[in-house]
Amino acid sequence: HTFTYTVTESGTAPGVTNDANTARKVSYIVTDDRAGHLSVKRDGGDGADFTFTNTYSVAPTDSSVTDQVTTVKRLTGRDLAAGEFTFDLLEDGVTVASGTNDASGNVTLSPIRYEAPGTHTYTLREACPNALGLYKGVTYDGTTYTVVTTVSDNGDGTLTATHKLEGTTESAGFTNKYHAMPTQVSIGAIKVLEGRELKKDEFSFKLVGEDVESTVTNDADGKISFDKFEYDEPGTYVYTISEVKGDEAGMTYDKSVFTATVNVVDDGEGNLKASVAYAKGDKSVEGIVFNN
């Protein structure tokens, strides 16, 4: 007589995919030898009666290094702007993640997808627009950090990524320095003499400002040129310019007092820019002219 049975698999386990064929049939033949004995033999021969093949796998996980490794951007010399600086994470020289800072200096890197357990060693650095490390008045920080990521199989079909800075450093910090290049301004005037020809160095003129005093003379063409002033900080600088009264008989000296106001601004790209405005009393003038 032949007996046929159906064997099924049931149950679930995290991360395990059961055999798509959930049922197996197996038959046994029972034989009577007419001598009081029964024998049983599986229909189909020797070997395993049946096999269920299940598959264990893990789901990929996305993880950003900066979720666990605090990365901070600092800028001295001016305010930091959101998205101003870029940071790269490299593995074997290839960029695998990048990101920027926010206005507070916090850096967020893009996530990396991990599909299997393992260990990854990364280099974290700031990206610089050129090899000099200097761009638009900003000196970039060339510091690099090593990040070691360990991806573990939790045994339930999931992966966990753990990111740690190598060494004793608790966080990755990058400090850039902003400094605008100085600018120079030339302040000059014109001397006009009526009644006779003007002579070189005939008249003297004084410029006075905060911690500044300079006296020069005219050239033969009437030009008056003070030394150039250099500025390394933004601000407003005010000077008064007047003619020094001489004692030549028959000469009427100009008693006018002019004001030169120099406004120095930082363009935010590493440059100081200056503009000069002239005034006589409370009236704006195009330039300074002394008439004798």
Show which residues each predicted segment covers.
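Solvent-exposed loop/turn and edge beta-strand elements of beta-rich ligand-binding domains
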Residues: 1-292
